[in-house]
């Protein structure tokens, strides 16, 4: 399992979500529906949470931007590599599967 953020995506998250912030993490989680689906019927989403509110199952540090996935959402991301990048023309985030 791996969630890879491009440098542009890291900067986007920092600018749009005011991260890094004291004891806050960027949490990727699973939601019902959505366009990009690793597993049918579900897609990734993100939110900012206090670190102590997340039972962390996966963690990456991107230049002080802490990305986490909770234990309960590991089933969705396991056995996959996901690339998260910024789409310049839309100023949005896009997901793609690497493996």
Curated annotation (Swiss-Prot):
Please identify the protein, giving its name as recorded.
Uncharacterized protein SH1556
Q: Which domain of life is it from?
A: Bacteria
The record's comment on protein family reads: Belongs to the HesB/IscA family.
Name the InterPro entries on file.
Answer: HesB-like_dom_sf, PdhI-like
Q: Which organism is it from?
A: Staphylococcus haemolyticus (strain JCSC1435)
